[in-house]
Each structure stands twice: as structure tokens, then as C-alpha cells.
């Protein structure tokens, strides 16, 4: 979690990066889906073709991890992941809805709003969550979902080229 101060922007940020295949074995297990995903997320996943479902569940998992990091807690550390619901706005962008312990944690640290961006590239998914208080002024130069995705794609392309076309998880996590 990163926290800024003053008017420099939203104060809480969480990021998660993973390979889509990391969840394959677990995502097939009913207990894991119940533990990680909200009922609306499970319903939506059930309507998708298998390859799209795999990508969807990985994206939602990364988004939940990013939101939990922005809340200052880890996965399975007092805030059930299923209480972080990643829905969609009318435009199709990810929409964060918190319930239960997740909503209480946000209130405890003064967060009124949390936004998340999810990007997929080949077998990687990244999610960035940003939380802020309504008392903080919104910045006029806040990046759009598309701008964040384009920036991620540019960093990933540079990192992949620098590694000779091979990007491992360990290297991805340590790349600047």
C-alpha cells in the first residue's frame, strides 16, 4: 500500500500482478470460488465461455488483491475477498462495491471511494486500485482507464524487450 499526503492525489494505492494460469487449479474448486468471489461475480463468470471465464476470474482476483492492499490488509487478513465485489459501470468499467468488513475497513481509514483498473496482456493481468476521501479534491488530470491500460502495455513491452522477450513473474514483480 502506498499513501500520499496533502493534495498530491488519492491517498491509498494497491497493485496486483499475476499470470492468469496461477489460478487454474484453485478456480475449479467450489470452496475457492465461494471464498474469493461474490455471488454476482460467480453468476457472471458462469455465463462466460471457459477461456473468457478464466481471464475474468483472474482479473477479478487481481482487482480484489489490489483493493485489499489499498485498504491496508492482505488477502485472508480479516477482510473476506468476497466482500470486495468488482462489478461494472454502465460503460463497462470495473466498479468496486464493499460490504461487511471491507466497508468497515474503508470507513475506519477514511476512504469514501475506491476505483480499480484491470488490464490483461497475453497471460498477465494487472489491477491497480486507488482509494480516496470525498474531503480530498479530485485531480483534474486523473488518468482514464484507457490511459492506465496504455501505460501498462508500454511498460510491459519495454520490460519484455529488455528481458529478451521472456518475462518471468519474479522479474515482472521486480521491474521498475
Regions found by a protein language model. Give the residues of each.
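Core catalytic alpha/beta fold that binds nucleotide/phospho-ligands
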Residues: 1-176
